[in-house]
Amino acid sequence: YKNLTLSVFVNAMQGWISSFGLIGRGPAERSLNFIDYGWWTPENKSNTRPSLMHENKYGHNYYLSRNFVRIQDVSLVYNFSKPLIEKMKISHLKLSLSGKNLYTFTDWIGADPESGAIDRDSLYPMPRTVVVGLNVGF
């Protein structure tokens, strides 16, 4: 629109499930303990989480959806008009703002549903970055 350009890339994956063995009590490698995560209780007769006391020794029984929609790349560029830049004695002037991995919509409780990392040494989220740029031509 006019001198403005917007570019958006949305990444989505549907139909993924993975075991998430870090749920439950147990040894240190299963150190993620989610007290309010749908455990079976007399009031909550869930059939997805057996019990908070279930040790889940082998990492089974905790299959979770890895479906996600991620706002992966957004770029906004403004090209300054010729009359303005000619007064400054330059050939072109462009201002840009871009972002990567701005937000992920998911029910996955790990750090990143795309990587599906399920052990404590790889629970790192995708880095979120924002960059501002200025392009000047003489």
Feature map (PLM): residue ranges:
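Transmembrane beta-barrel domains of outer membrane proteins
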Residues: F9, V77-S81, N135-G137
